[in-house]
Structure formats: structure tokens, C-alpha cells
Design a protein with these regions (language model features):
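Short S/T/G/P-rich N-terminal loop/turn motif that feeds into the first structured element of a domain
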Residues: 1-76, 81-93
Length: 93
């Protein structure tokens, strides 16, 4: 018998100028993610374009996470890390 998934997930997909620079910025922003109830981040890269990044994360508090994804803190961190264009951000259960 399958147990229903009760964990919400947050997926962020975007292109970056340079993966190494972006990854350092992503890692440095861990405290901010955790304070928003976002944990267990897994980073995936497109095999054909290593600067095309998808991040899958667990969400403990959807309201806090939604506030965080709309925050100037995240926008600034993404800009500093070299995110290109607007990210695609989705919540899923």
C-alpha cells in the first residue's frame, strides 16, 4: 500500500551565468532557506547545458515558503549568484 506524500515540494528552475559561482551563492543562502522552512535541497543540472539548473526542496511551511520566494532577499541572492532571466517556481505535493 502506498502512503500519500504529505510533504510539499518547491521546484525552482533557472539558467545561470556560471554554475560554480551560482553554487557558491546557493550554498551561502542555506540559513535563509531553513528559516523559511525549506530543507533538503537537491540540485540537478541539464546534461546538455550545465548552466541550466533545477533545485528540488522540501517545504515544511508553505505560507513561509511562499513569502520567501517573493522576497527581496531571494531576488537579491539570485541576482548576485548570476541567475539569468526569471526563474520558474512551482509548489507541488
Amino acid at each position: 500500500m502506498n502512503t500519500p506524500n504529505t510533504t510539499e515540494n518547491l521546484t525552482i528552475h533557472h539558467k545561470v551565468q556560471d554554475y560554480t559561482k551560482w553554487r557558491a551563492g546557493y550554498d551561502a543562502h542555506e540559513t535563509s532557506r531553513r528559516s523559511a522552512g525549506i530543507t533538503n535541497g537537491r540540485v540537478f543540472r541539464n546534461a546538455e547545458d550545465p548552466n541550466d539548473v533545477i533545485v528540488l526542496q522540501d517545504v515544511g511551511d508553505v505560507a513561509k515558503a511562499r513569502t520567501w520566494v517573493a522576497s527581496e532577499d531571494l531576488k537579491s541572492a539570485m541576482q548576485k549568484a548570476g541567475v539569468v532571466g526569471s526563474p520558474t517556481i512551482r509548489f507541488a505535493a
